[in-house]
Amino acid sequence: MLAVTAGSEQIRRAMQALEAAFLIGVEGVTEIWLVRHADCYQDMEEAEDPPLSALGRAQAQRLAERVKRAGPAAVYASPFRRALETARAITDEIKVDPRLVEMPLDISEDGTLEFHETAESATARMRAMVEDIVREHEGKRVVAISHGAAIIACLTDVLNVDPGRLRLLPYYTSISTLRVLGDRRMVGTFGDIAHLEADSLSPSGAFGATSP
């Protein structure tokens, strides 16, 4: 039971206003699904630009079933192999955008990730990518297959949060949504993996074996 004294019609209008404030159900909103690529680490043999693992291919198929039901206007992808293979499970008509790449990194001898791009640089290119998608597909739904740190850079920009303070990592094939209308930007969801079942989850967690 709602702890309010208003009538049902007032409550309904209030909830509609609340949803509109978050760009839910608003005409003209561009919705961007930021999707992390599927798993590529469980049976990895190529470290430079690995393909999807067997598990990753299964994850990509489950993602594809969900995305196809949503009917996106376009599918964008990073040029990295793991992102392209994830996108190809959805469609052969892929718009490759180098701004969706992962932040360049090395792995030190002790296993520490060392990024060679600043958070500011990653944020700027992801912001420009979002702006271009909105210009080209205004009012539509678009899917963009990217990478963990790049997606975080995009989301923290919208949330006005320091990337180093958001201790989250999107799971393989997870969907994080942005809603854009004019100069308004909202994060709708983060890390949605409703399309994955228990046997499709990577046993080593969101990072896989070594890196994002």
Which residues fall in each region the model found?
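Active-site-proximal alpha-helix that buttresses catalytic centers in soluble enzyme cores
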Residues: M1-I94, E114, A128
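Generic beta-sheet signal
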Residues: I32, D132, E138-A149
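Short active-site segment of divalent metal-dependent hydrolases/proteases
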Residues: C40, A150-I151
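Phosphate-handling substructures
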Residues: E48-A54, R88-D132, G188-F190, D199-S202, ...
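Short active-site oxyanion
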Residues: G71-V75, K140-V142, P163
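Short beta-strand scaffold positions
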Residues: A77-S78, A124, I145-S146
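Active-site signature of alpha/beta-hydrolase-fold catalytic machinery across serine-
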Residues: A89, A153, D157
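Domain-level recognition of soluble alpha/beta enzyme cores
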Residues: D162-M186, L196
